[in-house]
Each structure stands twice: as C-alpha cells, then as structure tokens.
C-alpha cells in the first residue's frame, strides 16, 4: 500500500493505493496518528484502492471519529467493489462516500 498525503491549510487528503488490510493497516494508523490536531477536514481518496479488509474498516471508523465535531471526513473515488463493502456494513449510512 502507498499513501500520499496532501495538505492545504487545515485540510488533508490521503490518496491510498493498493490493499488496505491487516498487513498494511499499521501504515495508515501511523499517518492518522501524525495528523496535526488543527486538521479540520480529512478526505480519503480511494481511486486506486483495490481491496479493504475489516482492519481497513476499523481505521475508516477511527478517522471518522477523529474528525467528529470538525468540518468532516469523507471518502471519494470509491470503486464499485469497495463501495459494496461499505454498503454491506452500513458505513455508507454514516460516512460521506462518493463513487468513482
């Protein structure tokens, strides 16, 4: 997995490529822990995410909770396959998710 973070003021976009699973989740967890406390908006760009496991879903929830009370958290450029995982788990009811 590769993560490219882009910061514009207090807004951060993380472009995540590859698989987000048990082996790669610690890398994203480290990125989330390093977020500036002044970050008001977080976007996960999943344009190149091929797969997400329960470990990845756990980090999505962690990011959602971390951004609670701020401008927000959303996920963009989600493939149909990854969107199906969010839909089956009900995450699409809580989190702003935009398909490709």
Regions found by a protein language model. Name each.
Residues 96-100:
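Short acidic-hydrophobic, aromatic-tinged amphipathic segments that line or gate anion-handling sites
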Residues 2-29, 51:
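STAS-typified acidic loop motif
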Residues 22-94:
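Amphipathic alpha-helical interaction surfaces in cytosolic regulatory modules
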């Amino acid at each position: 997995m590769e993560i490219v973070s882009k910061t514009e003021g207090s807004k951060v976009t993380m472009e995540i490529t590859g698989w987000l699973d048990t082996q790669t989740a610690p890398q994203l967890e480290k990125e989330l822990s390093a977020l500036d406390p002044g970050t008001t908006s977080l976007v996960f760009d999943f344009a190149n995410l091929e797969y997400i496991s329960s470990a990845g879903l756990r980090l999505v929830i962690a990011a959602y909770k971390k951004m609670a009370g701020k401008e927000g958290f959303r996920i963009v450029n989600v493939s149909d396959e990854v969107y199906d995982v969010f839909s089956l788990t009900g995450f699409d009811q809580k989190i702003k998710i935009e398909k490709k």
